Amino acid sequence: ASFBZAPPGBVKAGEKIFKTKCAQCHTVEKGAGHKQGPNLNGLFGRQSGTTAGYSYSAANKNMAVQWGENTLYDYLLNPKKYIPGTKMVFPGLKKPQDRADLIAYLKZATA
């Protein structure tokens, strides 16, 4: 199913998901450094593997995906299937609601 069919996202619920499942490896604040994963500030509309100062896998750079609601929705279901060879160890979020919530939060937090 695509993002168009996803339930409406809840920013607060998405923030909780980010804090429990993503924040150990990612930051969202402008100017915050990279951790295990890249800072996600300015994520929407950016091409995969292009954040300055972060060492990406060749897979991430070569995928050249444009991050947006649809691509993130698919990616977050199963990152390793979406970008084979990615360094991201996160197994993904199976529930459409969780993905919609996280995307709603990221849209706000990374803008």
UniProtKB/Swiss-Prot annotation:
UniProt's post-translational modification comment states: Binds 1 heme c group covalently per subunit.
GO MF, one example: heme binding
InterPro entries documented for this protein: Cyt_c-like_dom, Cyt_c-like_dom_sf, Cyt_c_1A/1B
Cellular component (GO) terms are: mitochondrial intermembrane space
Q: Which residues carry this modification: N6,N6,N6-trimethyllysine?
A: 80, 94
Could you confirm whether the keyword Mitochondrion appears in this record? yes
Keywords, alphabetical = Acetylation, Electron transport, Heme, Hydroxylation, Iron, Metal-binding, Methylation, Mitochondrion, Respiratory chain, Transport
Q: Which residues carry this modification: 4-hydroxyproline?
A: 79
- Binding-site list for heme c: 22, 25-26, 88
What are the N-acetylalanine sites (modified residues) in this protein? 1
Gene3D superfamilies attached to this UniProt entry: Cytochrome c-like domain
Question: What subcellular locations does the record give?
Answer: Mitochondrion intermembrane space
Purpose of the protein: Electron carrier protein. The oxidized form of the cytochrome c heme group can accept an electron from the heme group of the cytochrome c1 subunit of cytochrome reductase. Cytochrome c then transfers this electron to the cytochrome oxidase complex, the final protein carrier in the mitochondrial electron-transport chain.
Similarity field: Belongs to the cytochrome c family.
Write the protein's name. Cytochrome c
